[in-house]
């Protein structure tokens, strides 16, 4: 029997499962606790099988950590998490989302993100640890999506 997937904001009790899933997807877990309330999770029963987050910096946001448990891929979970995150971003009056990626440029493009020059990234996003760390990897791609 296939379990139905439910979606909700992450709560403090979800921190360990979110960290586990991000680690399995080889995504950073640093500072998750600071932004957990703006992460969305997908659940199959009590198990978190998908996650996505946004760090809010005024009218800009840093898109974080979209991943789905390997056993649950191909079911539209990533797309649904993305849609719910965009709806949340709109309620927060975020105009633009930024992301940094090494491997997911093609997938991010399918979600409406476009490659941009790092010089176009606003100061609020340049102050994040992700931006600072991106300088360590010359192949990191900077992307942006307008959502208004």
What is the predicted role of each segment?
Residues 4-17:
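A short beta-loop-alpha structural element at the N-terminal edge
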Residues 14, 59, 103-104:
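A generic "binding-loop/recognition-motif" signal
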Residues 15-51, 129:
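Active-site rim helix/loop that mediates acceptor-substrate recognition in acyltransferases
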Residues 41, 47-55, 60-67:
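Conserved beta-strand in the GNAT
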Residues 68, 74-87, 99:
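Conserved acetyl-CoA-binding loop-helix of GNAT-fold acetyltransferases
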Residues 87-103:
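Conserved GNAT acetyl-CoA-binding A-motif
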Residues 102-121, 125-129:
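Conserved active-site alpha-helix within GNAT-family acetyltransferase domains
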Residues 121-148:
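C-terminal "cap" of GNAT-fold acetyltransferases
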């Amino acid at each position: 029997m296939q379990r139905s997937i439910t979606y909700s904001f992450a709560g403090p009790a979800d921190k360990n499962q979110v960290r586990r899933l991000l680690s399995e997807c080889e995504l950073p877990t640093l500072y998750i606790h600071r932004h957990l309330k703006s992460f969305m999770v997908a659940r199959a029963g009590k198990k978190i099988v998908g996650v996505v987050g946004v760090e809010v910096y005024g009218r800009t946001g840093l898109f974080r950590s979209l991943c789905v448990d390997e056993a649950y891929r191909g079911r539209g979970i990533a797309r649904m998490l993305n849609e719910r995150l965009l709806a949340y971003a709109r309620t927060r009056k975020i105009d633009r989302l930024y992301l940094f990626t090494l491997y997911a440029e093609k997938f991010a493009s399918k979600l409406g993100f476009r490659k941009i020059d790092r010089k176009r990234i606003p100061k609020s996003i340049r102050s994040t640890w992700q931006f600072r760390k991106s300088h360590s990897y010359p192949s990191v791609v900077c992307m942006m999506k307008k959502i208004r």
